[in-house]
UniProtKB/Swiss-Prot annotation:
Residues 1-65 form a transit peptide. This is NFU1 iron-sulfur cluster scaffold homolog, mitochondrial. Residues 182-250 are annotated as: NifU. One of its GO terms (molecular function) is iron ion binding. It holds the Pfam family NifU. The lineage of its organism: Eukaryota, Metazoa, Ecdysozoa, Arthropoda, Hexapoda. It is found in: Mitochondrion. Keywords: Iron, Iron-sulfur, Metal-binding, Mitochondrion, Transit peptide. Gene3D superfamilies: Fe-S cluster assembly (FSCA), Scaffold protein Nfu/NifU, N-terminal domain. Belongs to the NifU family. [4Fe-4S] cluster binds at residues 219, 222. It comes from the Eukaryota.
Length: 283
């Protein structure tokens, strides 16, 4: 019976056109009531992105058109969302490049990683999220990112070569009913809200009542990512799918190893800079 109600509720969600934050407030309040935690509501999502900047950049004369690139703050101070005014991957599609070593499948990502201070690149439907290294200044990074984006879209090259965007919520033949409902809810209501803040949530698996998710883009290192998962995503999934007991964030072991190597490299580089030209070389 619970599964029938869950599917019916999801069908209702499909046909309901509520603002994402309004929907979140409703579900957070319902979840609190259901769990007998008292009145009130909790907001979820990576946060609210309010500030926008607009810069007009002129294309080369041969292109005979202008590109307007907007920037949008994210809840993560280390990440910034760039909106070029054209499709990047198209509706609902995302692709994450957490490190420069993962950019081999995208000419655009390769160019963006050449900008000093860029740590991560994330592509969405119509936006690009840039995550910077700690201590790097946006005032120095932004002009170079603007130039790279402008030149790239003027070139007509494909954003991705052979790689395919995320397809983690695609319904598979061997998915049971619970997994299908989890994917449906993630795809229709949760991911669009997170993507508004320059990130994404990827379904990694479901086992013994535990939903495993991976945060990407601005959400991967966002201080509020755990709050997003527990107070937002978990509450919503539990309300519509009683079989869900908890939500856990997972990390790729390869990403951890690359992070460790990158931090070691940065530390060595800072040491060399502090030593200066006279530090150890022949005079």
């Amino acid at each position: 019976m619970s599964k029938f109600l869950s599917q019916a509720a999801i069908n209702t969600l499909r046909n309901t056109r509520l603002g994402s934050r309004q929907l979140v407030r409703s579900f957070a309040g319902i979840s609190n009531t259901r769990n007998h935690r008292g009145a009130g509501h909790q907001e979820w999502g990576c946060g609210q992105s309010a500030e926008r900047g607009l810069l007009e950049l002129r294309m080369p004369v041969a292109c005979r058109r202008s590109m307007f690139i907007q920037t949008q703050d994210t809840p993560n101070p280390e990440s910034l969302k760039f909106l070029p005014g054209v499709d990047v991957l198209g509706k609902g599609n995302t692709y994450d490049f957490p490190h420069g070593t993962t950019a081999h499948s995208s000419p655009l990502a390769k160019l963006l990683f050449r900008v000093e201070g860029v740590k991560g690149v994330f592509f969405g439907a119509d936006f690009i999220t840039i995550s910077k290294q700690e201590g790097a200044e946006w005032s120095l990074i932004k002009p170079e990112v603007f130039a790279v984006i402008m030149d790239f879209f003027a070139s007509g090259l494909p954003v991705l070569n052979d790689a395919q965007p995320n397809a983690d919520t695609e319904i598979l033949e061997d998915d049971d009913e619970t997994v299908m409902m989890i994917k449906e809810l993630l795809d229709t209501r949760i991911r669009p809200t997170v993507q508004e803040d320059g990130g994404d949530i990827v379904f990694m698996g479901y086992e013994a009542g535990v939903v495993k998710l991976k945060m990407q883009g601005s959400c991967s290192s966002c201080p509020s990512s755990i709050v997003t998962l527990k107070n937002g995503v978990q509450n919503m999934l539990q309300f519509y799918i009683p079989e869900v007991e908890s939500v856990e964030q997972v990390f790729d072991e390869a990403d951890r190893m690359i992070d460790s190597e990158f931090e070691r490299f940065e530390k060595n580089l800072k040491t060399l800079k502090q030593q200066g030209p006279s530090g150890g070389g022949p005079h």
